[in-house]
Amino acid sequence: MAACAPVLAPHGVDDAVPTLTQATFQTRDGETLPLRIWGPTHPKAVIVALHGMSDYSNAFTPVGEWLTDHGIATLAYDQRGFGQSEHPGLWAGGDVLRHDLSDAVAAARRKYPGAPVFALGESMGGAVVLSALARSDAPNVDGVILVAPAVWSRSDMPLSYRTALWLASHTFPGMHVSGNGLKIWPSDNIPMLRALSRDPLFQHSTRADAVYGLVNLMDEARHAPDALPATTPPILFLYGKNDQVIPREPTEAVVKGLGDRAEVHRYEHGYHMLLRDLEAKLVWQDLADWINRRVADVVAHGRRPHPSSSSG
């Protein structure tokens, strides 16, 4: 049965200094991840953005270009196992993904000295960011943006789902599964979804053991609010009321757990892919407004800003 255990992507020795170029992010173990950067040379704020499952850094092209006109830089890398990274399709493990986030944030601070740095996570990326906040080596950020974070844990799933997942990942870990036939709409932006269906870098099926790894990560994110330290930076939580990917119940449980740490926006016409929905510009504007308030507070007081009260 050992040969049928879930497979993790290879990991090198942690002896490199994480660095950013215009097109790459070199990790602490020497892996080179594709990087995209949008923004002015001297931004007023910097966002390190993490994409969702099956996706890659191109997900942030529309919002990254829009934020550029508002003086905000966005840095997005292909997380391990996705896009043009090495070992596509193989799950890297939650700890490795969290280390990459912390290292990317530190490298961004070196690249843009003095600029406030924010971590943004969409779906799976949101699970990476949220779970990282509960760790002793949490990323050193001035604020966090969670966009429809993946928080559907085992405790929220039917027993049949949990059983099928374990059997598939431990019996046929390399078996590929897809969402075809589920009639789930991740967005109301049909042209965007059609473009993704033709994009060779978007993963149209997923290994069973990678799904198992994702659920492990969602478990950690789901329960992270209970372990957040008092030093947790302010959080902007964005969620669409028409999200068909992550159920509302665990999402609202996480919102409740975050309490006054988070400013919450629920979008009446929003789906899972909020940053690419038809009404995405409403979300972009809320995001920019929140960052502007956080930046103003940091500049005025020389400290991390205090969370605003929830709305929506």
Question: Predicted regions span which residues?
Answer:
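An N-terminal hydrophobic leader/cap segment in hydrolases
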Residues: 1-27, 31-40
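Short beta-strand element of the alpha/beta-hydrolase
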Residues: 44-52
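Catalytic nucleophile-loop/oxyanion-hole region of alpha/beta-hydrolase
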Residues: 54-57, 83-112
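Conserved alpha/beta-hydrolase
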Residues: 64-88
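Alpha/beta-hydrolase-fold enzymes
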Residues: 124-207
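Short beta-strand/loop motif that positions the catalytic acidic residue
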Residues: 231, 237-239, 243
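Short alpha-helix in the alpha/beta-hydrolase fold that links the catalytic acid
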Residues: 233, 247-256
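Catalytic active-site module of serine/aspartate enzymes centered on a nucleophile-bearing elbow/loop
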Residues: 261-311
